[in-house]
Amino acid sequence: MSKLNLEKKLKIVKEAKKLNIKKSTYLANKYDISVDTVESLVNRFEAFRIEGLINKEKKPYYSAKLKLKIVLYKLETNHSYDEVAKKFNIIYSSTIAGWVKKYREYGFLGLNNNIGRPKKIMKNPNKKPAKIKKSQVKINNDQQIKELKEQVEYYKLEAEFWKKFHTLLTKEKSTRKKQK
């Protein structure tokens, strides 16, 4: 499978539109790509036009709050990843799938961005750490306060999620009872 440039992607989408199909084994074989890739290209073009086909050099940044909002929307509405991606203007639906997986494994903390290089561990155990200045203590306290506020926000959102989840369950149970 070769990496597709923008011209090739547009050509594939144009041919798929001409044939009036989204999935095509003919196009997949012709361009040596998977059928799912053909479908993905057509869907991204329909949703975002040419912008959906352009490879970004830099990944877009999404805040943890936005990720949580999108994940909760996905879990509450049970829409497909593609539908949720269209609603929130996220080009790749697999991005949302990754967020949902992280949320299920680690909760809200799994949605935080770990950008950059991880901190180095002190290699020499005999080396003493530098003395901490008062200004650094203030910064550490401010950082700790910020982290605690984020935790409070997380627990509020989590409580809200479980309340909504509970109401959905009770609605579902009542509809099942009515059907019987």
From Swiss-Prot:
Domain of life: Bacteria
Keywords: Transposable element
SUPFAM superfamilies (UniProt xref): Homeodomain-like
InterPro entries per UniProt: Homeodomain-like_sf (IPR009057), InsJ-like_HTH (IPR055247), IS150/IS1296_orfA-like (IPR052057), WH-like_DNA-bd_sf (IPR036388)
PANTHER family documented for this protein: INSERTION ELEMENT IS150 PROTEIN INSJ
Similarity-based family: Belongs to the IS150/IS1296 orfA family.
Entry protein name: Insertion element IS1296 uncharacterized 21.4 kDa protein
Organism in which the protein naturally occurs: Mycoplasma mycoides subsp. mycoides SC
Organism lineage string: Bacteria, Bacillati, Mycoplasmatota, Mollicutes, Mycoplasmataceae
